């Protein structure tokens, strides 16, 4: 088997059926929501036992009045499962720029300035751009996607996003023949974001995908959740959704996308290289070094359920990794540069499961 972290070109993804776009009224929802983001999103949720649901610091909105209409898409764009409740989706979050606790992102949501917001796309692309988020959203029809989300900590949700395929943006800007990967960079504002003031991770948060992963039809740039503008605690105004990977790959509050020739370094692979690899595909057969990935706790349910390979999207994405040893780590570890600053053990002492974002080798 070949090394999954090599820089050789990868095969083209299989294309599932085209999704159905949302109604045009979504754009007005986004425009109105952007004006309220800084003041209306102070909800609550804490980095506690992952089976323990913390009470919000402030009452969460009633899902019947806070959320908008969701158009159920077709094919792989809908899991045909019950969606997680809006309160849970918006008060039980990992977004370390806003704090380490599950409730911190909702509590500190007003600290994230989502307008004005500029997005840069550069690197190995023929048409690099710098544009504001509202212009970017106007380029594409917005689509509903109801996806499973699986965190490496052992919990999961079913989340109704809306946004546009990353492939639509990349194809419009035309990657060069040398492009092999996409690196994503999140906001870096320690003067505003409380989670960036202590030294926990190296900021800004970065992530990456292979180009064929980025071009896959399931890969989404989300701008909304359950029919309304994306809440700050869920990564407003622009976040990545890659449903077959552990949740840490879904970088939030994106400000830059850079197409590269070589595999980019990513935040968690630098922080804990023995625990977090580049691919981070959901795999129940490969445990995290400190816990099993065979089962998961669906938030809002009792008991645990089996975890599905590729989070249930194997039919669509398994072909991307044909011949690759995505479970092995020996070559990956040997090829990785020395850590530039791992997460201090004191940062996760006392937590269960240990402090982590999402994703294993």
Curated annotation (Swiss-Prot):
Residues 1-57 form the signal peptide. It is found in: Cell envelope. It catalyses: L-methionyl-[protein] + a quinone + H2O = L-methionyl-(S)-S-oxide-[protein] + a quinol; L-methionyl-[protein] + a quinone + H2O = L-methionyl-(R)-S-oxide-[protein] + a quinol. Pfam families: Oxidored_molyb (PF00174). PROSITE patterns: TAT (PS51318). Mo-molybdopterin binds at residues 93, 96-97, 151, 234, 239, 250-252. The keyword Signal applies. GO terms for cellular component: cell envelope. Keywords: Metal-binding, Molybdenum, Oxidoreductase, Signal. The keyword Membrane does not apply. Predicted to be exported by the Tat system. The position of the signal peptide cleavage has not been experimentally proven. GO terms for molecular function: metal ion binding; molybdopterin cofactor binding; oxidoreductase activity, acting on a sulfur group of donors, quinone or similar compound as acceptor. CDD domains: YedY_like_Moco. Residues 10-22 have a biased composition (Pro residues). It is an enzyme of class 1 (oxidoreductase). Its cofactor is Mo-molybdopterin. Binds 1 Mo-molybdopterin (Mo-MPT) cofactor per subunit. It comes from the Bacteria. GO terms for biological process: protein repair. Residues 1-29, 49-77 are annotated as: Disordered. Its EC number is 1.8.5.-. Its main location: other. Heterodimer of a catalytic subunit (MsrP) and a heme-binding subunit (MsrQ). Belongs to the MsrP family. Part of the MsrPQ system that repairs oxidized cell envelope proteins containing methionine sulfoxide residues (Met-O), using respiratory chain electrons. Thus protects these proteins from oxidative-stress damage caused by reactive species of oxygen and chlorine. MsrPQ is essential for the maintenance of envelope integrity under bleach stress, rescuing a wide series of structurally unrelated cell envelope proteins from methionine oxidation. The catalytic subunit MsrP is non-stereospecific, being able to reduce both (R-) and (S-) diastereoisomers of methionine sulfoxide. This is Protein-methionine-sulfoxide reductase catalytic subunit MsrP. The lineage of its organism: Bacteria, Thermotogati, Deinococcota, Deinococci, Deinococcales.
